[in-house]
Swiss-Prot record:
NCBIfam families: endA
Active site: Y119, H127, K158
Catalysed transformations (reactions): pretRNA = a 3'-half-tRNA molecule with a 5'-OH end + a 5'-half-tRNA molecule with a 2',3'-cyclic phosphate end + an intron with a 2',3'-cyclic phosphate and a 5'-hydroxyl terminus
GO BP annotations listed: tRNA splicing, via endonucleolytic cleavage and ligation
EC numbers for this chain: 4.6.1.16
The entry's keywords: Lyase, tRNA processing
Entry-linked SUPFAM superfamilies: tRNA-intron endonuclease catalytic domain-like, tRNA-intron endonuclease N-terminal domain-like
Protein name (record): tRNA-splicing endonuclease
Originating species: Saccharolobus islandicus (strain Y.N.15.51 / Yellowstone #2)
InterPro entries in UniProt: tRNA_endonuc-like_dom_sf, tRNA_intron_Endo_cat-like_sf, tRNA_intron_Endonuc_cat-like, tRNA_intron_Endonuc_N, tRNA_intron_Endonuc_N_sf, tRNA_splic, tRNA_splic_arch_short
PANTHER family, per the entry: TRNA-SPLICING ENDONUCLEASE SUBUNIT SEN2
């Protein structure tokens, strides 16, 4: 199991060989100081993981996260810690996990004004075809919010997907928007 260190709101894999291994098994994380490596051998620095990626990898048994006191944070503890740091973590994590289980590569979508950028092949191999916004199915979305989501996805030439999470059943439903000229 790969050793990873919790540092605030990030998790670091200091060993470069272990970083390569994790990156090559699904494009997890980003190498410190290297943007969009095309090949795992391009990973020559430690790997930085988001909390969402770390929780997922811990649940899968691929990483062991250790805090500053040397305590191992099992999946449940790491999930609880992340919930305190990230707004709507439960919703975001549920969508992340669902997309990963469906075989997609899921990265942060912050620069696109979304929760996630989603790839079919991977970063560095293609531009992300989708931006995903995770929403509680019981949450109201105003027309203004919907239009602002759409503007960002349209200007970056990505398909906008709303991921609707039902907290009771833990199911995720997706709605994809297609913009047309009239």
């Amino acid at each position: 199991m790969v050793k990873a260190l919790l540092v605030g709101s990030k998790v670091l894999i200091p060993n470069v060989d272990e970083s390569r291994y994790i990156y090559s098994n699904g494009f997890y994380g980003k190498a410190v100081g290297i943007s969009k490596p095309k090949d795992p051998k391009d990973i020559i620095r430690p790997l930085e993981l988001s909390l969402i990626e770390s929780v997922y990898l811990a649940k899968k048994g691929l990483i062991k996260v250790i805090d500053k006191n040397g305590e191992v944070l099992e999946y449940e503890k790491l999930y609880e810690y992340s919930s305190k740091i990230i707004n709507k973590f439960d919703i975001m994590y549920r969508v992340y996990e669902d997309l990963r289980e469906k075989g997609f590569i899921v990265r942060s979508g912050v620069k696109y004004g979304a929760d996630f950028a989603v790839y079919t092949l991977g970063p560095g191999l293609e531009h992300a075809p989708y931006v995903v916004i995770a929403v509680d199915i019981d949450e109201e979305i105003t027309p203004h919010e919907l239009l602002s989501f759409g503007r960002v996805s349209h200007s970056t030439r990505k398909r906008l997907v709303l991921a609707l999470v039902d907290r009771k059943s833990e199911s995720v439903r997706y709605i994809m928007f297609k913009w047309v000229k009239m």
